[in-house]
Amino acid sequence: MGYPTLWTDDAKLFEWTKTEQRFNHDDFYGSMPTLTKNLRQGQPVAGSKVHTDYSNGFLNEYSLNQGIVDFGTFKSAITDYHGYEYKNHGYGLALTDTDLLGGSSGSLVFNQDKKISSIYSAATESDSVGYAQLLPVPKDVNGVSLVKYSYDLILWW
């Protein structure tokens, strides 16, 4: 008792064969998803970077400065989520080296000051670029931020 009972292909008369399964460190930890590719280990900023190398023509045409994109200009960018189609609006970040798997939407994206900057929402299938929606920061009439950091998670349109 205590060992898992596994069915074998050559079992006769519906006999069950007991087999011991040993823990394999490489198989277990080697298949675990990671949050980011560790391409910049040891560098001051080891996480994903904004996608400023616009090798993708789609991003090159519609991107703003420093990896910021306007989702409203992506006229053909319809995203599928659990069978429902939707389109993002507003500004966001195009991130490279995210290496996030399906189900990562809603993950927080932090800036170099370890403050929340955006929420991860989607990825392109072709070039491993991820998109994150920027969190709005309230500003005064002169365009100056009222507070250093502010998080407004309510979206309206």
Curated annotation (Swiss-Prot):
<dbReference type="GO" id="GO:0003723">
    <property type="term" value="F:RNA binding"/>
</dbReference>
<dbReference type="GO" id="GO:0003724">
    <property type="term" value="F:RNA helicase activity"/>
</dbReference>
<dbReference type="GO" id="GO:0005524">
    <property type="term" value="F:ATP binding"/>
</dbReference>
<dbReference type="InterPro" id="IPR009003">
    <property type="entry name" value="Peptidase_S1_PA"/>
</dbReference>
<comment type="similarity">
    <text>Belongs to the MG067/MG068/MG395 family.</text>
</comment>
<dbReference type="InterPro" id="IPR001850">
    <property type="entry name" value="Flavi_NS3_S7"/>
</dbReference>
<dbReference type="InterPro" id="IPR022381">
    <property type="entry name" value="Uncharacterised_MG067"/>
</dbReference>
<protein>
    <recommendedName>
        <fullName>Uncharacterized protein MPN_589</fullName>
    </recommendedName>
</protein>
<dbReference type="Pfam" id="PF00949">
    <property type="entry name" value="Peptidase_S7"/>
</dbReference>
